[in-house]
């Protein structure tokens, strides 16, 4: 998945729509155990759940690409949504990584 | 933040270390309300919390870049970690976006 094709700017037609794009790349070590669950797949659901808490997402406006290469797994998510789809509430999140 | 410089491949020196890189770009609509909290900042903490649930992260191995441009806000996260830092448990996550 070429990063650039994924993050290509949108046409200016949809003025009242916004776009969220996410790329998650996991570069694995040579001797990482093959049996271990793929980190990207583990993270994908929970990250999508975080996004869905803050943005009302229409299923057909979500593109998800997952690629597992030689030493790298890559997840690409592209979500388009109307301006008012973002929830106003400012949630308080405990910080795990400072 | 140029996507390419962020996702540049690591040197092959650290064979037993892995790397997780995330880029989150939010393309805002021209008339989105200025008073609204920045979506990227809202999502940043919760996504980092999701990652920290599955990877034991050393604080000094986490790089976070946040850029707010004309119509786009971009978050870049780069985490390096040892092979055994990934938790083995395979959590069951409810799916919000299919």
UniProtKB/Swiss-Prot annotation, chains A, B:
One annotated GO biological process: cell division
Asked if the keyword Membrane belongs to this entry, the reply reads no
Keywords per UniProt: Cell cycle, Cell division
Coiled-coil region = none
> Which protein family is it in?
Belongs to the MinE family.
NCBIfam families registered for this protein in UniProt = minE, PRK00296.1
The role this protein plays is: Prevents the cell division inhibition by proteins MinC and MinD at internal division sites while permitting inhibition at polar sites. This ensures cell division at the proper site by restricting the formation of a division septum at the midpoint of the long axis of the cell.
Protein's recorded name: Cell division topological specificity factor
């Amino acid at each position: 998945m070429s990063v650039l094709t994924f993050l290509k700017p949108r046409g200016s037609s949809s003025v009242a729509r916004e776009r969220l794009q996410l790329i998650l790349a996991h570069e694995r070590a040579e001797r990482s155990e093959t049996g271990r669950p793929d980190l990207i797949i583990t993270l994908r659901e929970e990250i999508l759940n975080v996004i869905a808490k803050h943005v009302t997402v229409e299923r057909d406006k979500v593109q998800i690409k997952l690629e597992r290469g030689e030493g790298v797994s890559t997840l690409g998510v592209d979500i388009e949504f109307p301006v008012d789809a973002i929830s106003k509430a400012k949630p308080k999140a405990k910080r795990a990584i400072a």
